[in-house]
């Protein structure tokens, strides 16, 4: 079971795919630099879960570019 629930995450970020990519990027950052943690305590022991908790709390928001370049 996903914790935090998907509907709670989608109230912050509308797209499941954007949630996944945002969480993955943030999890990599947390894994490489744990001192960048934004919450005082996490329920999850893994970086992906911690990233999802940050998204659910509103601490992390994705930056989306409308520009397409090749």
UniProtKB/Swiss-Prot annotation:
GO BP terms in the entry: DNA-templated transcription
EC number assigned by the record: 2.7.7.6
Keyword Transferase: yes
Disulfide bond annotation, renumbered to this chain: none
Keyword entries, A-Z: DNA-directed RNA polymerase, Nucleotidyltransferase, Transcription, Transferase
A GO CC term assigned to this protein in UniProt: DNA-directed RNA polymerase complex
One annotated GO molecular function: DNA binding
PANTHER family, per the entry: DNA-DIRECTED RNA POLYMERASE SUBUNIT OMEGA (PTHR34476:SF1)
Function: Promotes RNA polymerase assembly. Latches the N- and C-terminal regions of the beta' subunit thereby facilitating its interaction with the beta and alpha subunits.
The protein's name: DNA-directed RNA polymerase subunit omega
Species lineage: Bacteria, Bacillati, Bacillota, Bacilli, Bacillales
Gene name of the record: rpoZ
